């Protein structure tokens, strides 16, 4: 009786290259203009969360690690925080631009509220961008303070005057920030003051139309 034999043939098939089976992730729709601004794809400094001392430390660390020449791109997502920290980071950006002549670009993502808008004001309007669906919120500075009057009557007016001077100085700082925010835009300073009194939420498209930012990504 003849012995039957079976032959097993194994065929190795290489998978198709990944790029041929996976769709490209770049948005090429007519509504997308991301390709017009390739520098914004990966910001050198990426900030998110509350504007506070921790964010300032992150800002300084990322700035030190960033390239020392060419445009510097900074992105931020924040609901607000300490306006003085925002001003300090903004001054660093301004001094970098003035001393080195480097271009600095701002990219707001999702929310640029309160102190975030203060930081944005450190960038020229033609260097500001927002991602689609983002919003800016601008409001007046807030103060919570209790004045305790204790002592001879003739000395009490000094305490009141000191608090009044503090308020006046805070208003002047606010005015400086408002002027920087609208400088070069279509928004009048008086209009910003009026809207900021009740918190002004500005959608990305409106911000672009008003000239507060150059474009939307």
Regions found by a protein language model. Give the residues of each.
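Terminal-region recognition feature
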Residues: 2-217
């Amino acid at each position: 009786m003849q012995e039957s034999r079976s032959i097993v043939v194994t065929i190795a098939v290489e998978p198709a290259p990944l790029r041929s089976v996976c769709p490209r992730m770049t948005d090429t729709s007519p509504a997308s203009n991301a390709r017009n601004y390739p520098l914004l794809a990966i910001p050198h400094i990426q900030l998110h969360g509350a504007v506070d001392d921790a964010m300032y430390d992150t800002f300084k660390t990322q700035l030190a690690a960033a390239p020392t020449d060419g445009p510097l791109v900074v992105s931020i997502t924040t609901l607000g925080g300490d306006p003085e920290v925002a001003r300090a980071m903004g001054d660093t950006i301004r001094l970098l631009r003035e001393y080195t002549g480097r271009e600095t670009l701002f990219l707001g993502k999702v929310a640029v509220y309160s102190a975030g808008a203060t930081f944005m004001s450190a960038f020229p309007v033609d260097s500001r961008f927002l991602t689609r669906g983002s919003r800016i919120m601008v409001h007046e500075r807030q103060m919570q303070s209790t004045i305790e009057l204790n002592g001879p009557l003739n000395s009490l007016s000094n305490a009141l005057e000191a608090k009044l001077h503090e308020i006046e100085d805070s208003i002047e700082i606010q005015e400086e920030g408002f002027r920087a925010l609208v400088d070069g835009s279509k928004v009048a300073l008086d209009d910003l003051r009026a809207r900021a009194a009740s918190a002004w939420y500005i959608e990305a498209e409106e911000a672009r139309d008003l000239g507060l930012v150059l474009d939307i990504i």
